[in-house]
Amino acid sequence: MDANVSARINLMRILLISGIVFVHVPYNPQWSPFLGNYGMLDWLRVFLGESLFRIGVPCLSAISGYLLFRRGLADFDYWKTLKTKARTVLLPFLIWSGSFFVVVYAIQRQGLGFGYLPDTINATPRQWLSMAFAVEATPVNLPLYFLRDLMLCILLSPLLALLVSRYPRVTLLALLAYAILPLPNGIFLKKSILFGFSAGIYASLHGVNIKMLDRFAAPIAAGFLAIAVVIAVGLYYTGPDFPLWLDMALRLTSIAGIIGSWAISELLVRTRFGEKLGRGSGLSFWIFCGHYPLLVLFWMIWNRTGLSYYPLFYFTAPFIAIAILVASHNLVRRLAPDLLAVLTGSRTGAKRMATQPPQGAQAGYSPQQR
């Protein structure tokens, strides 16, 4: 893999995960963006949280599928992969998700936190398993359902690779229908993750030149953003109970965002800002796992201040959360690098990327980064 692709993948990860932070900003029903109380600001909330940044989940899963099989099916060692992913995905998921459940339970035992998070005190042991580890439903650390579904994709990866290699069109069309049609989720909590992961496998196994559309990056990016704007307008005027056709269009747009976000990465990676963001990967995982507890904490504090201008909270809380997570990541990296390695699945950061070869040279990913 050349250094440009490697940097763009890291850039996409940090941008998409930062965008996902906006998706998870909490609000009360009286401050729903679909009420239009704040006019254009509410539409912007819908655009960011319900349209544009919904591309994050399928895009991130596509990256995972692509990297997992980028050396081909013949060199794929399933048992070695499971062992690696147990350390790089499963263990961090269990720690981040389980520890937040314990914190929430302890807080609610003191009579705090009710209404902000699921009721852990009166839940059954079966419900606890989902709250802590997303066994049947989303966990209390909401975004981490992605890691749970990603592990399922990894467990199914030999079967998915076999189907995608032998019957690519039928397989991808079937998974696309599963993702966008109102079908039961089955064992997955988010259906688009399976399609994104399989699309990434397809790109690897069939040798797709993922840079072939780079010369059209600007019009592709503009077209995707225009579609996201149109979808946001429809959501704003019909939400929160969207008509079925619009909900399907939203799901399809989020999947199309795989191509759109890749085009955007081509435009950004050559800028100084994009080059800097493309140097590391551990930070994005840290932000992904840690942002939701911070947002809930900020929301609890906000509701005690008596302030009523919700846009102030919406447009400041994500940036404060990201700033805290960047600072804490740097602090833990300096003071407890072994702990950081466990919490981020042994992902390397800027130090490794600082020595990456120049553009056009080959840049590999460690099993941890894949």
UniProtKB/Swiss-Prot annotation:
Segments for region (Disordered): 350-370
Entry GO CC: plasma membrane
Pfam family membership, one: Acyl_transf_3
Biological process, per Gene Ontology: enterobacterial common antigen biosynthetic process
GO molecular function: O-acetyltransferase activity
InterPro entries: Acyl_transf_3_dom
Domain of life the protein comes from: Bacteria
Intracellular or extracellular location(s): Cell membrane
Membrane topology per record: Multi-pass membrane protein
Family: Belongs to the acyltransferase 3 family.
Descriptive protein name: Succinoglycan biosynthesis protein ExoH
Species per Swiss-Prot/TrEMBL record: Rhizobium meliloti (strain 1021) (Ensifer meliloti)
